[in-house]
């Protein structure tokens, strides 16, 4: 657990910072080429990524971010297709989850199936995870190749390309800033999670 924590945090020296101390190049980076049409707060992840598992399932950073956001803001999550044998299929499946509004039900089960039990070996196994999450098999099947899902897949791929994504987990704000996890307070897990959410909230307020 300690090794995973250090890896996620970037293995940097601990320090504390208030919002006034947040600065470009430390806790966040300003993109050279902003993407104005990007969702307000956008997280990229992969069900194959061990750090993404820790990010979401152990430290619950996405939950902390969502709770810190103003009422009119939302955290959007996109899956990437460049990791793992079934990366493209899982990106398509995540589009199904978005279309059906079952992201929160599917995410923990899919992370466990891919990384813990390692029971996702073929596309049919992905379908079974959705069924275990309470989605009717016929609903999954009809959504899988729908226009809406195809559009969502293209949307995820385009966002990753436009933002020149290099790795996951990654969080972008207003298509202009990227959170730098190696510049956050690592004195404790709680401080790290809180500051991650605070930086996102701070960046949302920037013009």
UniProtKB/Swiss-Prot annotation:
UniProt keyword annotation of Disulfide bond present: yes
Domain of life (superkingdom): Bacteria
Signal peptide per UniProt: 1-19
Localisation: Periplasm
SS bonds (residue pairs): 49-52
SUPFAM superfamilies for this protein: Thioredoxin-like
MF (Gene Ontology): disulfide oxidoreductase activity
Cellular component, GO annotation: periplasmic space
Function: Required for disulfide bond formation in some periplasmic proteins such as PhoA or OmpA. Acts by transferring its disulfide bond to other proteins and is reduced in the process. DsbA is reoxidized by DsbB. It is required for pilus biogenesis.
Protein's UniProt name: Thiol:disulfide interchange protein DsbA
Species this protein is from: Dickeya dadantii (strain 3937)
């Amino acid at each position: 657990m300690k090794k995973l924590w250090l890896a996620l945090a970037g293995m940097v020296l601990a320090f504390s910072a208030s919002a006034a101390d947040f600065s470009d190049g430390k806790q966040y980076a300003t993109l050279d080429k902003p993407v104005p049409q990007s969702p307000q707060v956008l997280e990229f992840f992969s069900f194959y990524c061990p750090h993404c598992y820790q990010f979401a399932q152990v430290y619950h950073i996405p939950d902390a971010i969502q709770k810190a956001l103003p009422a009119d803001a939302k955290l959007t999550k996109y899956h990437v297709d460049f990791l793992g044998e079934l990366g493209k299929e899982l990106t398509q499946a995540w589009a199904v989850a978005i279309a059906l509004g079952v992201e929160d039900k599917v995410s923990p089960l899919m992370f466990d199936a891919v990384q813990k039990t390692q029971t996702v070996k073929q596309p049919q196994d992905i379908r079974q995870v959705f069924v275990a999450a309470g989605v009717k098999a016929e609903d999954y099947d009809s959504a899988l190749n729908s226009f809406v899902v195809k559009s969502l897949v293209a949307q995820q791929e385009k966002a990753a390309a436009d933002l020149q994504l290099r790795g996951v987990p990654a969080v972008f704000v207003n298509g202009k800033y990227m959170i730098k996890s190696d510049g956050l307070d690592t004195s404790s897990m709680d401080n790290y999670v809180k500051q991650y959410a605070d930086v996102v909230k701070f960046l949302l307020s920037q013009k």
